[in-house]
Amino acid sequence: MGRRSKSRALSVWMNGERVGDWRRPAAGGQEFLYAESWLSSPAARPISLSLPLRPSREPYRTGVEAFFDNLLPDNRQIRERIQRRFRTASIGAFDLLQEIGRDCVGALQLLPEDHSPVNVKQITGERLTTDGVAELLTRSLGSTFAREESLEDTFRISLAGAQEKTALLFREGVWHRPTHTTPTTHILKLPLGTNPQGIDLSTSVENEWLCSQIVRAYGIEVAQCWMEAFGEHKTLIVERFDRRLASDGTWYLRLPQEDLCQATSTSPGLKYESDGGPGIGDIMELLLGSEQAAKDRRDFMRTQFVCWMLAAIDGHAKNFSVFLLPRGAYKLTPRYDILSAYPVLGHGRGKLSPEKIKMAMAVHGKNRHYRWKEICARHWLETAKRCGFGEMKTIIQDVIARTPAVIQQVRAVVPAGFPAQIADSILGGISTRAEQITVELSG
């Protein structure tokens, strides 16, 4: 059972500076107001492209809930587990984030209105053994506390997405549970298991690791990651690109960023283009305003094409992000959360039909095309043309030319004991796609 919400306002902080206040007025709704001190700070920047700095300090009332909602898992079951664990009034963004908003994606910390972060420029944490990490992962899957664990001692972090995960501090080769305001530096992702449709995704750790190697080999910047086991828990460890050690080595900075649902004021429930979320054209238009627009637009289209080659069909707007720079500037972050459908393609129980699977964002011909198997090179060229982007054919030719070397390079780093079905299906899949595109382009 939930409890009544304790607060009608949370203070929003970034690296020890107060950014503003997130409020629930008595009349209803939500609002966000930038702090006057933040507007005059050398570090000032908006918390979102959808909530620009306002010198007038007029509060925002639209788009506020969508922004903060996107800081949380969009999986209802995970939200309900957080609700039970922290005994919150609801699974709404405000109620959950007042409990777990101390270490969010990006740079934000959410604290009670009358609190401020302490010891920001220090690194503190509780050292963890391998068994300690395993115990923490086990506990993260539960909905209740260990008897000796109090609410005050509980590790409170918020990670968006639909997957079971937690985050820790990794420093000088040792794992720590950060304390006070020290941020986490690495995300630990557990296997997805079997989804509600009966699709076995228990090898998602190996799948995502392999996809990251492939994407990097194609020349795309992607989050660094590795695989590691903690007791019974197979884990993908992802280095956070929204964290950076300060130049003096004494503390970690939180780097401001947001996903493209936040940037476009899109609710996480509408993250897919077919549901009303941003599509390729919307994002290419947004990237025209990037600090490095030409590079970001080129990298985004290259990523889209490579993900299609990979049958990585879940590339919705939450799986792309931008760094937020001073005074409203921004640029694309590295890629992340890329998972191939090749290992589960087929017909029958527990399989995804290749004829039915859809990409998260459509490409264009005479009509919109979502179905993965129907998409051809000409659709990519037409989509790029509509976006005012003239480099798509060069990108396609380069990706196809690189594919044999990419396969060879990635096979060379696949570790012993890696599931052969995962490696063979994904690497074989991109090889087949490359051959098909070669035939189409030469026809």
Question: Where does each model-flagged region fall?
Answer:
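Phosphate/dinucleotide-binding and metal-coordinating scaffold of catalytic cores
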Residues: 1-317, 321-443
